[in-house]
Amino acid sequence: KQEYIKEWFANYFLNYSDISFDFRDGKNEMTIHHSYLDNWKVTVVDTGYDTMTGGRIKRIQEYVGDEPFFMTYGDGVCDVDINKLLEFHLLHGKIATLTAVKQAQDKGILNIGGDNAVKAFREKNANDGAPINAGYMVLQPEIFNYLTDDTCVFEQAPLLKLVEEGQLMSYIHTGFWQCMDNMREKNKLEKLLFEGLSLRHISEPTRLRRISYA
């Protein structure tokens, strides 16, 4: 549904401005008085309907340049402080950092060493207390060397190779996190919203502006 995202940004300036429309006496004039815009540069990329997660990241390579960038799947709600996440990533100097949370989820989990390096992936059950991948990452441009084509699944060969080479670190998040992969999880989030869930919002702008949605 990329067309909805493109339409939203195409109308962003119009919808966040004070505007007068003058149609008197046959005129057709628009006067913009004030605008209330964020200092953004947004690139919306068509990565292909059937493209796998690694292939989607590969397709944005030309827009990223030579600086680190954030990556998220866009199917979870989290109050992680991305400024602290970025600071942690820049300090350790590895290629990739993923955010890890401890949640009762039936998903693949992480074996994490004492130095926060990810040692292995394995499957878990709902009662397993080990951390899982929360889906918020910081990646160096070198990550593109681990990606092949549209069939590349980021969570398989690329991440496993990063683990083998000691290039994947974990940032432990102890705040709110909830994925939305199915109707049950959607209902859970809507119930929290209805009950007045208040998440901490990050007001301090981060130095990185590029975010990839795989």
Task: Put a short name on every predicted segment.
Residues 57, 71, 96-99, 170:
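Structural beta-sheet core signal
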Residues 3-7, 13-14, 64, 68, ...:
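Basic phosphate/pyrophosphate-binding loop/patch that engages nucleotide-derived ligands
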Residues 51-52, 109-123:
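Acidic/His-rich active-site region of diverse nucleotide-sugar glycosyltransferases
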Residues 68-70, 77, 81-90, 103-105, ...:
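Catalytic-core segments of class I nucleotidyltransferases/pyrophosphorylases
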Residues 47, 72, 97-100, 121:
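Generic beta-sheet signal
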Residues 5-9, 147, 189, 211:
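Hydrophobic packing residues within well-ordered alpha-helices of enzyme cores
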Residues 201-214:
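Single conserved hydrophobic/aromatic residue that forms the stacking wall/gate
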Residues 1-73, 84, 182:
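Conserved N-terminal catalytic core of the sugar/cofactor nucleotidyltransferase
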